[in-house]
Amino acid sequence: MNMMRTKAGLTLIETLITAFLLMAISIGIFSAFRQILVVMESIRTRSLATALANERLEIIRNIPYASVGTVSGIPAGVIPQEEDVIRNNYTFQVQTFIRNIDHDFDGTAGGFPNDTSPADNKLVEIRILCDQCQNYRTLAFTAMVAPKNVESASTNGSLFIYVIDANGEPVSNMDITLDNGMLIPEVHINDQTNVDGVLQIIDAPPAVSSYEVTAGKSGWTENRTYSSSDIGGSIPVFPHATVLQQQITQLTLVVDRLSTINIESVDEFCAPVGDFDFNLRGTKLIGTTPDVYKYDQSNATSLGGSLSLSTIEWDTYTITPIDSTYDLVGS
């Protein structure tokens, strides 16, 4: 008698299904392992950043109060405004902001009662950045530093910088640069407005028309102060700020988001006219006697008769033809 034997095995489809399942499981395990590594790296970098910030705060707590300030800052001191520090092969950018704070328990500068020494305490803010770290967000740490002795009347003043948009609304987190090369030591500050669109520089050294202020950031227009020499001898509409002893100087700068102007040059048959030369001028003045316009530039359309200007601020603009062949008929 012949006995028929059957051999157990896998068909091609079963083999493919098994291989697919094994591959899916392997990918899942690998992805989970990779995610664990990412989380561990994030925890490690945050721990390093936190330790670095605590180290900086401890240094500040142990230096004389008069030295608690930034190099070329207000208040002036021994702490660098920016510094790169390497820890465990990670390069961290350490930014230090130190501001004089005016508390209202003894009055405020310009208030009632008037505080003739408004620099009551110093607010220290340390930001730790890491460009090479994955899944890392900038960490910020703050601390308040107070003097041991009773304050005396200040011989300095205050500069309050307000930033608003075209609708008069305050603009928070606007980048502010403040420079004064006439003082000893010089002042060079990079900071931001608060939630109310204000940056208060308290206990600033007195100086006449020498505090240069600029407000602006990516995607926004820039507004700044000027000296007469910056604009060819005209009188600045927004001159460099003056700070007087025990007085508050208030400066308002208006900024808004950048816009785009698209210009096309065509003839009477609506055919493109290439390389058309024209002048584009806004109405905003940065100087008078004689007038100096904030935007006053000569431009030309492309060979296809078009031009796009993408870094334009809000204003009313006038087009004046300066082309040797064509004139402007309508708009």
What are the residue ranges of the model-derived segments?
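N-terminal leader/signal peptides at the extreme start of proteins
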Residues: 1-10
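Short, acidic Ser/Thr/Gly-rich low-complexity loop/linker segments typical of extracellular
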Residues: 181-203, 284-308
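Aliphatic-rich helix starts adjacent to a transmembrane/signal segment
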Residues: 10-54
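Extracellular beta-sheet/turn segments enriched in Thr/Pro/Gly and aliphatic residues
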Residues: 152, 229-258, 262, 331
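Structural motif
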Residues: 160-173, 256-258, 263-277, 283-288
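Short Pro-Gly-centered beta-turn/loop motif in secreted/extracellular proteins
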Residues: 195-219, 299-325
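Low-complexity, Gly/Pro-rich coil/beta segments used as flexible assembly/activation regions
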Residues: 43-172
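Edge beta-strands of extracellular beta-sandwich domains
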Residues: 141, 220-231, 327-331
